[in-house]
Regions:
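Secreted peptidase-domain scaffold signal
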Residues: 2, 7-86, 144
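Beta-strand-rich interaction surfaces with strong enrichment in secreted/lumenal proteins
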Residues: 40-42, 121-124
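Short solvent-exposed strand-capping/beta-turn motif centered on an Asx-Ser/Thr pair
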Residues: 77-81, 93, 139
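Solvent-exposed serine/threonine-rich low-complexity stretches and specific carbohydrate-binding patches
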Residues: 99-107
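Aromatic sugar-binding surface patches on proteins
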Residues: 108-119
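Short glycine/proline/serine/threonine-rich loop/turn segments at secondary-structure transition edges
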Residues: 124-130
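Short beta-strand-plus-loop segments that form exposed binding edges in beta-rich domains
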Residues: 135-143
């Protein structure tokens, strides 16, 4: 945190806690291809948004079944006139919101984001099963 320090560390207490620490289970990965590649691109007009919802089951009954989340990664290909006009928000089944990409007023690039990974840890510990929502918003620069 840039505003607050963390004080002095009690090395003895830290060592005692470390000896009792329970480790996490091995890393598991569960992948969903939400929008098949053969679907036509979606057009989002300035000032509007596109909402993509999908259901995840956490790879239930598979060797890589998940019961809680550590991080989520969304990989997208997006073409736009102004990249800075885009905002991406992911909403979990528990209604936690995570902004994956904020509006950026100084980003006027039109270079596409091709297979671009957006990662978040805001859903840490949540159950992955249920309805997920990805909102892609496009603001209208002229309305600033």
């Amino acid at each position: 945190n840039p505003y607050f320090g963390f004080g002095l560390i009690d090395a003895r207490l830290a060592t005692l806690i470390a000896k009792q620490w329970r480790t996490l289970p091995p890393f598991q990965q569960c992948v969903y291809d939400v929008i098949p590649r053969h679907i036509s691109p979606r057009f989002i007009a300035p000032g509007e948004k596109s909402v993509i919802s999908f259901y995840a089951n956490g790879c239930r009954n598979k060797p890589n079944e998940l019961s809680f989340i550590e991080h989520v990664e969304v990989v997208l290909t997006i073409r736009t006139a102004f990249r800075g006009d885009l905002k991406l928000t992911l909403v979990s089944p528990m209604k936690t919101n995570s902004t994956l990409l904020h509006y950026r007023s100084k980003d006027a690039s039109n270079t596409p984001l091709k297979n671009w990974p957006f990662m978040t840890t805001h859903f840490w510990g949540e159950n992955p099963r249920g309805k997920w929502i990805l909102e892609i918003s496009c603001r209208n620069r002229r309305l600033k």
